[in-house]
Amino acid sequence: NKRAYDSIGECMRKKIIIIMTAIVLFGGFIAGYRNINQKYPARKVETAEKGESLEFLDGVKISASGVKWLSTEEQAAIYENSGIDTSKVNYDTKIIEVNVCLKNTTEEEKEVPITYLSLETTGVGTAISRELLMGNSEHYSSMVEKLEPGEEKVVTYPYEICSIWFHKKDWKNIEMRSFWMTFASYPDKIVLYL
């Protein structure tokens, strides 16, 4: 009888220790989670519709002014000029050209690095295609744009979209998807809708 009582008591002590340990671990998890959220708060999203401008760099405004999906023939010419042999690629691609307007609002010359501009859609993001840019420099703008005081300039950049990034059904309707430009993601995400 005493053994059974000791066995029950031992079992209860183990359960109490396990429950207390779980409570302490859970409390530590919650405290850590709150600490991380205070150090790294949720990002704010600043958006602009097509034609609206946002501050890109100090004194430089940017706005999306146009989008063009290249035809198969136009795309083939761009790849050929870039020296890219697409016959060895086992997936489809599309090239989207994005026009952005840069405006220097200062009284001094500005050099604007464009490498920050990314093209995004739900679940996928891509940078300016340097290979296409360099191989077609007469058609596309530079990776660093120079702007005189008060100058406004429309520049064009190519972005390559690959079928392997999407489900087949999504790829069939790729040109119908919503795309946007971003140039900052944290602490503030800045979005230019196309």
Report the location of each language-model feature:
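Short, Lys/Arg-enriched N-terminal segments with co-localized hydrophobic residues
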Residues: 1-11
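Conserved functional micro-motifs across diverse proteins
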Residues: 9, 13-97, 101-194
